[in-house]
Regions:
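A non-catalytic structural micro-motif
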Residues: 156-163, 195
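Generic structural signal for well-ordered alpha-helices
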Residues: 145-150, 185
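Acidic/histidine-rich helix-loop elements
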Residues: 32-38, 91-98, 130-137, 220
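Oxyanion-hole/transition-state-stabilizing segment in secreted/luminal serine hydrolases
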Residues: 70-85, 99-143, 151, 162, ...
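Structural recognition of the beta-strand scaffold that forms the well-ordered cores
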Residues: 60-65, 88-93, 118-124, 128-130, ...
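Catalytic His-Asp segment of secreted/periplasmic serine-dependent ester chemistry enzymes
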Residues: 168-243
Length: 243
């Protein structure tokens, strides 16, 4: 291949690579309120477990969410066993789930518990922020969260919903993804839904300057046992009828 042909081929390859990169950078997020299966490789085993734990079971409290909810069974396991198992709590959290994936699981299972829960606790939106690197507008993420909430309230007409504000995304209060998370929470606080309490634990997780309190997080989003204790402390007055 002579130099001119090689240069032309290299130019074409560079242009093609640039086009692919631009397409990935401009990728549009999936509709947050349209059910879609989470296809990440660890999901089938986890979904099988939560499905078996849900269908036909007594349910006093239903936790719906992503890995932060799932990890009640790991970092929060001692608290879960002591505080929530006696309340017949069911963990319907799957790591990596966005709002669309939670909706898919709700449709697939029909949330067919044997007894309707007294409370549903919903924490959603973290992976809508993370997967799309902040490209999904806050209004769209809230649209997905609201759709989950509406379906839960419709499915369980006597149940009360505790809608959690999204927990902090990253230790830097000035980062774009943290600002997106806070924007989502501002919009969540404006929602008007029946039988719903909107609850934030972020004041317990953050210092006054917005950075992480020591010992609350094991990484940029996931809680330690101490973080789960803060969540439990906020939930228990509501679950026990004191709030």
């Amino acid at each position: 291949m002579n130099a001119s042909v090689f240069s032309a081929a290299f130019l074409l390859l560079s242009l093609a690579s640039s086009a692919v990169y631009a397409a990935l950078s401009d990728e549009v997020s999936d509709p947050p309120d349209v059910p879609k299966l989470n296809t990440q490789p660890w999901v089938p085993a986890r979904y099988k477990a939560v499905r078996e734990n849900l269908l036909g079971k007594e349910c006093g409290i239903l936790f719906v969410g992503d890995s932060i909810t799932e990890c009640w069974e790991r970092e929060g396991a001692a608290l879960w066993k002591r505080l929530f198992v006696p309340m017949k709590a069911v963990n319907f959290g799957v790591s990596g789930d966005r709002t669309d994936s939670m909706l898919w699981r709700m449709e697939d299972t029909e949330l067919a518990v044997r007894t309707s829960p007294r409370y549903c606790i919903l924490l959603a939106g973290t992976n809508n922020i993370g997967l799309w690197k902040g490209r999904q507008p806050a209004e769209q993420t809230v649209k997905g969260i609201r759709e989950i909430a509406v379906r839960l309230l419709k499915r369980f007409p006597e149940t009360r919903l505790i809608l959690m504000e999204v927990t902090p995304y990253g230790p830097d209060p000035d980062s774009p993804l943290r600002r997106r998370q806070e924007e989502i929470n501002r919009l969540l606080r404006r929602l008007e839904l029946p039988r719903t309490t909107i609850l934030s634990i972020n004041g317990s997780l953050l210092k006054p300057d917005g950075t992480f309190r020591e010992g609350m997080f094991k990484d940029h989003v996931h809680l330690t046992e101490k973080g789960y204790l803060a969540w439990a402390d906020a939930l228990l007055p509501l679950l026990n009828g004191e709030g």
